[in-house]
Amino acid sequence: MSKVDKTGYAQWVYLLPERSSMMSFIDSMEDFRFDMLIYFLCFVVLGRAVQWFLRPKPNAPLLNPRRFFEFSDSRAVSEILYSTRQVLEDWFSKYPTKPMRIIADLGQITILPPSMADEIKNDPRLSFIKASTESAFHITIPGFEPFREGAKNEAGLIKNVLHKHLNKTLNHITTPLAEETCLAVQEYFGSDQGWHKVPLRDTLVPLVTRISTRIFLGQDLCRNQEWLRIAASYSSTSAEVANHLRRWPKPLRYLVSLLSPECQNLAKQVRNARALINPILERRRVEEGQEKGTSYNDSLEWFERYAREAYDPAATQLFLSVVSIHTTTDLLCQALEDISSHPEIIKPLQHEIREVLKQEGWNTKALYKMKLLDSVLKESQRLKPVQHATMLRLALEDITLEDGTFIPKGHQISVSCHAMRDNEIYENASSWDGYRYYRQREQSANEHKAQLSSTSPEHMGFGYGIHVCPGRFFAANEVKVIMIYLLLQYEWRTPPGSQPKPLSWCTTWATDPTFELEVRRKGSDDIPVELSHNTFSRESES
């Protein structure tokens, strides 16, 4: 036991340093820890800098590099944001076979000439899904679950469903497709027989949403205004929110999403979608357990049948909306704008439609035989596709292409679409010619290649290669059905002095969202009797 002095303190207490000495010691230790922290952080930053400096880099020429002492890509991106098309055409007119790089809104991307499309089209080391979902959207943040579902499907659930069900049932879904179009066109374009202006894109987006929903989700949801509102708006809303979050450093984005009203609204859209979709699935699962369960033939049933792991049904349906509605709408808008600028093509189109329908009735064979309509749509897509560069991919490992172009792991690549307007490939390439592909299909060697749904390095409207749009056959039929009704039941024209101005930012190219057409309903129904609504109903019930 320690000895105790007269004051009552153990003698060892006097051996402790004075308070001032103790505080000095503590301060010195804190200074030491702070210095070590600074040294450690400097070491980490220096290590990352050395790692970045020494890592392999893409070797294609960079057209809009950062300037000296620039620490962000903001200026470089703004420099090219609205001039990407011209930059691509200028570069490839000088160097037709030489890749180049730009700093775009999603970072650096190497853009290849169309001549290299065949080399990369089926390369498994290049991921379309990771480039189009994980790189562009924030799949771990609430509200972006549809892109998370899409990111699972490099060659999985969604692709299987589209290939094995949607494409194989095209003939069976043609009648309900036409039935819904008959009703929807009347609702959205109206019955006014006087000339009146129609905001083209704002009218066609809900129209396409409703018609697509009829096939994907059935009759009930295609008339549900809440679902139509969510499906039509989610694509543009998610893109805006994704752009907003990209302004923040990655570690802060989740926190920002919790505080941002825009992010909360996006998450609410997904919750509302689940509130509509999940009860339908639950009811079907109950019916399935009964002896006389109802049979369904829509994408809800298809996904349930092919899902091998847990998935989010509502988010999957929203992802389908993202990849289908706005691209289909864009093609429709462009075709209507082009036809209104070339009214001489209208009567031949109407004649073809009437004659084919009288001969074949209402089926996919009839749509296939409408070669002039197919040609008109493909020509509009040729002159204004939805992107200046397509075949977006992200490298899963370091890749060196045949010409020596190096693509490091994690780098994005794409292929320029300028060949679609190349005078060396197309006669009068800059002019719209509705008969261009019609004439090509008269030559047996080009019968397949000249169809709207066909792709090649010279026409990549639906992409190209292993990741070509799997829903392009349905999209082509859907656009044709809508065009049939608009051509036979309505007249339209471009208002005097009006000229649509497509929007271009980075590699995206969209039709003018403010453009209006003048439209009027024809006085008499110009559609053959077998296409009446009553006929549809009888066919659907039989």
UniProtKB/Swiss-Prot annotation:
Keyword line: Glycoprotein, Heme, Iron, Membrane, Metal-binding, Monooxygenase, Oxidoreductase, Transmembrane, Transmembrane helix
Regulation: induction: Expression is positively regulated by the TRI6 and TRI10 core trichothecenes biosynthesis gene cluster transcription factor.
EC number(s) per entry: 1.-.-.-
Subcellular location: Membrane
Keyword Transmembrane helix: yes
Gene Ontology CC annotation, any one: membrane
Keyword Ribonucleoprotein found: no
Membrane topology annotation: Single-pass membrane protein
Pathway it works in: Sesquiterpene biosynthesis; trichothecene biosynthesis
Positions annotated to bind heme: C469
GO molecular function: heme binding; iron ion binding; monooxygenase activity; oxidoreductase activity, acting on paired donors, with incorporation or reduction of molecular oxygen
Annotated glycosylation sites: N167, N297, N428
Top EC group: oxidoreductase
Transmembrane regions: 37-54
InterPro entries documented for this protein: Cyt_P450, Cyt_P450_CS, Cyt_P450_E_grp-IV, Cyt_P450_sf
Signal peptide stretch: none
Listed cofactors: heme
GO biological process: secondary metabolic process
Function description: The biosynthesis of trichothecenes begins with the cyclization of farnesyl diphosphate to trichodiene and is catalyzed by the trichodiene synthase TRI5. Trichodiene undergoes a series of oxygenations catalyzed by the cytochrome P450 monooxygenase TRI4.
Further remark: Trichothecenes are sesquiterpenoid toxins that act by inhibiting protein biosynthesis.
Family: Belongs to the cytochrome P450 family.
Protein name, UniProt field: Cytochrome P450 monooxygenase TRI1
Species annotation: Fusarium sporotrichioides
